Swiss-Prot record:
Gene field: PATB1
Catalytic residues (UniProt): 77, 215
Protein's UniProt name: Patatin-B1
Signal peptide from the UniProt entry: 1-23
PNPLA domain ranges (all copies): 32-229
Short motif (GXGXXG): ranges: 36-41
Organism of this sequence: Solanum tuberosum
Length: 386
C-alpha cells in the first residue's frame, strides 16, 4: 500500500510536468539503490565491484570510488550496509571500503553474523557479533560525514513510523545524525532474524531522542529505489548545482537499482490447498516472503513505466537475478559453499541479457553507465573550475 501510494504521487507529479529538453549531462542526478537480502548482498556486491572497476578503467584512476560518481546512494537491510561501506570516510576522507572489499567482508564475517545463537522464543541470531563488527568498521562516524548523500531507511516500532536517514534531513531533524553503526545494525534487524535496536542521539541544544528500530524493509519492503529517487528529487530542487532542473523529470535522473535475487518473480509459490492447512506462524513467514517479492516486482514495474513515459528508459537499469535455486534463495545461509554459489550467481548475471527484448547484457549496460558517470563527473569538474 505504501509503495503504491508513493508511486501514484510520483506518477501524477510527472504527468503535471511540462515537456522539457533533456538536462545537461553535468546536471543530471545520479542515483544508486541497493536492495536488502541478508547474505544475498554478495550478488549486488559483485555488480558494484565490476562497475567500480569500469570507472577506474575509464578514468585511468585506480583510486576512483563509487561515491565519487553518485549523488545519492540508498539501501535497506544489507543494501544499507553496502551503502555505508562505500560512503563512510576513512582517516583520509575517502571511502573506507572499495567495492572489491565487500565480498571478502561477507566471507570473513558472514558465518559469525549468521551463527545460530537465539532460541525458539526469540530471534534466530542475537546480533552481538554483527554490532561488534559494525562498531569496529564504522567507528564513531555519523550521517553528516557520509561522502555523498545517502538514503537509508529503518522503522521505529515505538512510534510506528519509518525513519529515513539522509544528510539533507539533518538541518530540520538534527536528531537523525546518528552513528553509522547504530543505523546499520538497525536496518539489519529483520524481524525473526535479529533483535530490534535501541539507541539515543543528542542534539547540540541538549535534546535527547530515542530510537527503537528494525529492518528498513518493513518500511520500503526490500527495494529502496523509490525512496532513493525521492531523496534525489529533493536534492535536485535544493542544490544549485542542478539549476536546470525545475521540476521532477526522469530525463534528468540516472538510476541504477541492484537486487539481491529471487527464484522467479516471487520467491516461492504455493497452492490454495497447501495454504488452507497453514497456522498463524506459517502464514506470518509466507506473508513476509510474498510481500517482499511482490513489492520488489511492482516497484521495478512502476519505475520502468515512469521512465518509459518520459522517453528515458535508458536512464534506468535494474540488475536482478530471477532464477535463484536451492540455498541461494536463503538470506541467512552463510556457509562457504553457499557464498561461493552467490559469487557465481553475480558473475553469471553480468553475462545475461538485460531483458528478453534486448541483446544487451548487464555487463554491457554497466559499461555504458560507467561512461555516462565518468563523462558527467568530468563535465561537472570542468564547470566548477570556471
Amino acid at each position: 500500500m505504501a509503495t503504491t501510494k508513493s508511486f501514484l504521487i510520483l506518477f501524477f507529479m510527472i504527468l503535471a510536468t511540462t515537456s522539457s529538453t533533456c538536462a545537461k549531462l553535468e546536471e543530471m542526478v545520479t542515483v544508486l539503490s541497493i536492495d536488502g537480502g541478508g547474505i544475498k548482498g554478495i550478488i549486488p556486491a559483485i555488480i558494484l565491484e565490476f562497475l567500480e572497476g569500469q570507472l577506474q578503467e575509464v578514468d585511468n584512476n585506480k583510486d576512483a570510488r563509487l561515491a565519487d560518481y553518485f549523488d545519492v546512494i540508498g539501501g535497506t537491510s544489507t543494501g544499507g550496509l553496502l551503502t555505508a561501506m562505500i560512503t563512510t570516510p576513512n582517516e583520509n576522507n575517502r571511502p573506507f571500503a572499495a567495492a572489491k572489499d565487500i565480498v571478502p567482508f561477507y566471507f570473513e564475517h558472514g558465518p559469525h553474523i549468521f551463527n545460530y545463537s537465539g532460541s525458539i522464543f526469540g530471534p534466530r541470531y542475537d546480533g552481538k557479533y554483527l554490532l561488534q563488527v559494525l562498531q569496529e568498521k564504522l567507528g564513531e562516524t555519523r550521517v553528516h560525514q557520509a561522502l555523498t548523500e545517502v538514503a537509508i531507511s529503518s522503522f521505529d516500532i515505538k512510534t510506528n513510523k519509518p525513519v529515513i536517514f539522509t544528510k539533507s534531513n539533518l538541518a530540520k531533524s538534527p536528531e537523525l545524525d546518528a552513528k553509522m553503526y547504530d543505523i546499520c545494525y538497525s536496518i539489519a534487524a529483520a524481524p525473526i532474524y535479529f533483535p530490534p535496536h535501541h539507541f539515543v542521539t543528542h542534539t547540540s541544544n541538549g535534546a535527547t531522542y530515542e530510537f527503537n528500530l528494525v529492518d528498513g524493509g518493513v518500511a520500503t519492503v526490500g527495494d529502496p529505489a523509490l525512496l532513493s529517487l525521492s531523496v534525489a528529487t529533493r536534492l535536485a530542487q535544493e542544490d544549485p548545482a542542478f539549476s536546470s532542473i525545475k521540476s521532477l523529470d526522469y530525463k534528468q535522473m540516472l538510476l541504477l537499482s541492484l537486487g539481491t535475487g529471487t527464484n522467479s518473480e516471487f520467491d516461492k509459490t504455493y497452492t490454495a490447498e497447501e495454504a488452507a492447512k497453514w497456522g498463524p506462524l506459517r502464514w506470518m513467514l509466507a506473508i513476509q516472503q510474498l510481500t517482499n517479492a511482490a513489492s520488489s516486482y511492482m516497484t521495478d514495474y512502476y519505475i520502468s513505466t515512469v521512465f518509459q513515459a518520459r522517453h528515458s528508459q535508458n536512464n534506468y537499469l535494474r540488475v536482478q537475478e530471477n532464477a535463484l535455486t536451492g540455498t541461494t534463495t536463503e538470506m541467512d545461509d552463510a556457509s562457504e559453499a553457499n557464498m561461493e554459489l552467490l559469487v557465481q550467481v553475480g558473475e553469471t548475471l553480468l553475462k545475461k541479457p538485460v531483458s528478453k527484448d534486448s541483446p544487451e547484457t548487464y555487463e554491457e549496460a554497466l559499461k555504458r553507465f560507467a561512461k555516462l558517470l565518468s563523462n558527467r563527473k568530468k563535465l561537472r569538474a570542468n564547470k566548477a573550475s570556471y
